[in-house]
Regions:
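Charged, alpha-helical interface segments at or near domain boundaries
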Residues: 35, 48-50
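Alpha-helical interaction segments
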Residues: 21, 54-55, 202
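Catalytic-core regions built around general acid/base machinery
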Residues: 64-78, 193-196, 221-226
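Short, flexible loop segments at the rims of nucleotide/cofactor-binding pockets, characterized by
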Residues: 54-62, 179-186, 209-211
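Extended, H/D-rich, highly charged conserved domains that either
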Residues: 1-43, 58-61, 68-176, 182
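SIR2/sirtuin-family catalytic core signature
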Residues: 185-272
Length: 272
């Protein structure tokens, strides 16, 4: 696939030849179209729920994560909370904004106080090129030199107008895309550093992860760099057998929970 060889320097001549090949160009065009489709799909989902509807949901829900977020505003237990998310959407950012919880996006904004930091190694619909004209179109130009993170900026409005952005599509490995997507490698390194900073007194929560083979390499990198003595909670009603086995073998203080309703009580080391 495109992902497997695009970063190999010795393949550059072959890549250029393939761009000029009518036979193979269809696959590269499909790759370009997939990026635009994913951006547009998640942007449309985002626009389907206006802020007032989201605030209404947050005010009446018993969702465990909301309980956790609300606890953050009153608790002084944690001086820093880091979210490493592989989601393209901006629901987390919007929820934190609605709850008036300051946060920063790693690579784009300075840390807030108290510090809630979000790291998105696979990109986001909010990552767009600087000075980009908001016209919807599919660009078939293949930029083999890549886009660095300082060439991107955050945007939260009119996201359906952007045909280009920064996301790693499914089956993409940010390590192998360090040439064509250096912004992703920067954020992947930031996530690794965050993992290394975890101490035995810290809490780690894992959820929403399938442990599919294409993401396994990245997830293993984070898991193996975490402190084995930290408190580790995995939330999944049907945990993948392979992932569960890995977590049991790594972490001494491992707890598996079936519902996010439990997350609301993780502060102070308690469950609800």
């Amino acid at each position: 696939m495109f992902f497997d060889f695009v970063n190999e320097p010795i393949q550059k001549a072959e890549r250029v030849k393939m761009v000029d090949s009518r036979k193979d160009r269809i696959y590269l065009k499909a790759y370009s179209e997939l990026i635009v489709y994913l951006r547009h799909l998640f942007s449309c989902y985002n626009d389907s729920i206006p802020t007032d509807k989201l605030e209404e949901f947050l005010s009446g829900t018993k969702w465990g994560w909301v309980s956790f977020f609300k606890s953050l505003t009153a608790s002084k237990e944690y001086d820093k909370i880091t979210f490493v998310t592989y989601n393209y959407d901006i629901w987390l950012e919007r929820i934190l904004s609605c709850l008036k919880i300051p946060f920063s996006i790693k690579g784009f904004e300075a840390e807030t106080t108290p510090c809630v930091e979000i790291i998105k190694p696979h990109g986001s619909i909010s990552f767009v090129p600087k000075n980009y004209t908001t016209t919807y179109s599919v660009s078939y130009s293949l930029d083999f030199e890549g886009v660095s993170i300082d060439q991107l900026e955050l945007k939260y409005n009119d996201l359906t107008h952007y045909g280009k952005g920064a996301i790693i599509p499914p089956a993409g490995d940010s390590m192998r895309l360090n040439v064509t997507a250096p912004w992703s490698q920067h954020l992947r390194n930031a996530a690794k550093i965050a993992a290394l900073d975890i101490s035995e007194n810290d809490e780690v929560v894992l959820c929403g992860i399938s442990y599919w083979h294409v993401d396994r390499r990245e997830l293993d990198e984070l898991l193996l760099n975490l402190n084995q003595d930290s408190g580790f909670t995995f939330i999944n009603p049907s945990p993948p057998r392979d992932l569960n086995a890995v977590l049991i073998s790594i972490f001494k203080n491992y707890v598996q929970q079936s519902s996010s309703s439990e997350i609301g009580g993780i502060l102070n080391g308690k469950t609800v």
